[in-house]
Amino acid sequence: MVDMDWKRKMVSSDLPNSPKLSSKLHVTIPSPFKIVPVSSPISCSAPALCSAYELYLRLPELRKLWSSRDFPQWTSEPILKPALQALEISFRLVFAVCSDTRPYINHREWNRRLDSLITKQIQLVAAICEDEEEEGISAEAPVGGGRSSLSLLPQLATWRRSEALGKKILYTIDNEMSRCKYTLGLGEQNIAGKPNLRYDAICRPNEIYSLKDNPYADHIDNHENQTLYIIHQILESWIYASGNLLNRIVSSIEEEKFGKASNDVYLLEKIWKILAEIEDLHMLMDPEDFLKLKKQLQIKSTGKNDAFCFRSKGLVEMMKMSKDLRQKVPAVLAVEVDPTGGPRLQEAAMKLYARKTECDKIHLLQGMQAVEAAAKSFFFGYRQLVAAMMGSAEMNATASQESCDSLSQIFMEPTYFPSLDAAKTFLGEFWSHLG
């Protein structure tokens, strides 16, 4: 029970005709209040499984491309480089799907899903570029006059099988980059005559293309092998970008640049949603061919809470870092955690919400909770995806006898932000008593 009389006094001047409240408003609040380390159900699979996953996707080679710094003065390069490389790999997926001659493949739905996924990626790239301009660093971006000569997209826009989708992508780039000072330079119209980003120098499409084959390409005769490989390379590229974005969010909060952190935290939410859309592409793979590939690649559960996604060290780290944003709430609210477990944080949050004088902080806290929702949704959706692709027996095999599987534990965990949750509970109860 918590005394809410201070809140009544705080807002009473704004509500002269409101019904009189009792001197004390008592509400039941979620527990616990005290921020304590929460045992996380997420951890990497066995080292041998993680290593096999990395070698299959050629992640060590990709990581060198993601982490290369060709333009040290350009502060957005660590985020935009892997993002643009994810986009380029997506063009390779379009090429692979359009080249697939199997008569039983749902090409129409593939085209729709790829259009949607690439559009969302372009929107996210454009949002990152727009934020550069707001922060006054767009001048650092490497631009030039020429278009890309190495990207696959111009070829997709002229090849008969992919022409419609390729031209649609070019139109999307033109539209989404309209608010930026430069454009991507992939063959879009660019009627405004804006400078082109030095796409080839940043993205290195030729080096990306050199990684087009996985180690099993020569001795596994299964078209879904290439599809699976490309899908996960796109996924891992965005995961790498998110790690750099999370580091930037933490730095911005520590420097009290809450507006910048707010912009970035919503970009992070979008990345989680893009990851879910990438995973959903698995549903378009042929069921029998996919299960045959699973056998050929010797992919199997160990039966010890070993969901397949936990073989990605990057994804596990991304989830942990997203969850650890909860530790930055006291810094945002400018109060210290009460060592006795008192309601110091939630009271500060309620005052922040009510006064509305520090909007950047409100937006940041809302964004943090949006990231939590998106991350938990990703793992919930992934659990359903595994069951749909491989059967529920496969999903149940990852659960131990003592508890439910790790994926279920993730989205069933209590909120990562109990103080914000309690503050909103109080405010909701307060306003409900005014009516």
UniProtKB/Swiss-Prot annotation:
Secreted in keyword set: no
GO biological-process terms attached to the record: cellular response to hypoxia; defense response to bacterium; L-tryptophan catabolic process to kynurenine; response to oxidative stress; response to salicylic acid
Physiological role: Positive regulator of basal resistance.
Compartments reported by the entry: Cytoplasm
Phylogenetic placement of the source organism: Eukaryota, Viridiplantae, Streptophyta, Embryophyta, Tracheophyta
Entry GO MF terms: heme binding; metal ion binding
Organism (species): Arabidopsis thaliana (Mouse-ear cress)
Gene that encodes it: HSPRO2
Entry-linked Pfam families: Hs1pro-1_C, Hs1pro-1_N
The name this protein goes by in its record: Nematode resistance protein-like HSPRO2
